[in-house]
Design a protein with these regions (language model features):
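Short catalytic/ligand-binding loop motif for oxyanion handling, primarily in non-cytosolic enzymes
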Residues: 15-19, 40, 91-96, 162-168, ...
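Surface-exposed cleft-lining segments at the edges of enzyme active sites
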Residues: 110-141, 187-196, 236
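Acidic carboxylate-rich catalytic motifs and surrounding loops in phosphoryl-/glycosyl-chemistry enzymes
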Residues: 156-160, 214-231
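Substrate-gating cap/lid alpha-helix
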Residues: 166-219
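Histidine-centered active-site loop/cap adjacent to the catalytic His
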Residues: 232-261
Length: 261
């Protein structure tokens, strides 16, 4: 029997869902979601926002974690076997409030419909300004791991967005479209365009982390990526089929076995 191993996540449901395909000897020790690395460009600046309407503990935790910059101070100090980092939530962009504070434009925060947010400056993912903030924040995150002696446990996940559906799921997808229209040709065409545009924007972010910061990276080829029409979180270009998560886990296993690769 293998010794118990632990993983900490800085990223999205993509990494979180992939951990379900790890062996039973793995435990999820930490999950820092909805927290753009771009906000790490500025130190902790708690904005004066009314968060009382956040209904779930998860919503409260991720929004407060974003404001507190929890990923940069908790993960470098956490005794885990691997820190898995994905950049999916960078797509959300960030908001600069009137006082200069940076917060991630998460669905939880936007859903509060606060006047401080509606009048704030939005810094969109993919713009030069967002990328410049990301470079500073990502560098701080990696530096914190390096200073704690845990940077070799950091692995970046590079898995492209997709609108491709596996052969076994295509008939099911047609049935779902006939039932409720959620997977209509128009919807799937939009997903394909969004996936292509977003993947192009992500390339310089991935290159910076992999090449400039020297972080070990798992790349999942597009031919191994497919979405799941019946994914528990719904139809989206980053809600993958089981085979994609298995490919992620295989890459993670190789990266752990050879941390210098």
């Amino acid at each position: 029997m293998r010794d118990a191993r632990t993983v900490g996540i800085y990223g999205s449901c993509v990494s979180r869902d992939a951990t379900d395909y790890l062996g039973s000897d793995w435990t999820l020790a930490a999950y820092h979601a909805r927290q753009s690395a771009a906000v790490l460009a500025l130190p902790y600046q708690r904005p004066d926002l009314d968060l009382s309407a956040l209904s779930s503990r998860f919503q409260q935790r991720v929004v407060m974690g974003d404001h507190l910059r929890s990923a940069v101070w908790e993960l470098p100090r956490l005794a885990v076997d691997v820190v898995l980092w994905d950049l999916v939530d960078e797509r959300l962009g960030v908001v600069r409030l009137a006082g200069g504070e940076l917060v991630t434009r998460s669905v939880e925060l936007v859903g509060l419909d606060l006047p401080e947010l509606t009048s704030a400056e939005v810094i969109e993912f993919g713009t030069d300004e967002h990328f410049d903030l990301f470079r500073v924040g990502a560098s701080r995150f990696v530096t914190a791991l390096r200073q704690s002696g845990r940077v070799k446990r950091l692995v970046l996940l590079d898995c492209p967005f997709t609108a491709r559906v596996g052969r076994a799921d295509r008939r099911r997808l047609r049935r779902e479209d006939e039932a409720d229209g959620t997977a209509s040709p128009t919807r799937m065409a939009w997903l394909a365009d969004y996936a292509q545009t977003t993947n192009t924007a992500y390339r310089r972010y991935v290159r910076f982390v992999r090449d400039a910061l020297g972080v070990s990276t798992i790349h999942v080829p597009s031919r191994k990526v497919a979405l799941d029409p019946q994914h528990r979180w719904g139809l989206a270009p980053y809600h993958y089929a089981p085979g994609t998560y298995r490919a992620i886990v295989r890459g993670l296993t190789r990266a752990i076995a050879d941390p210098e690769s």
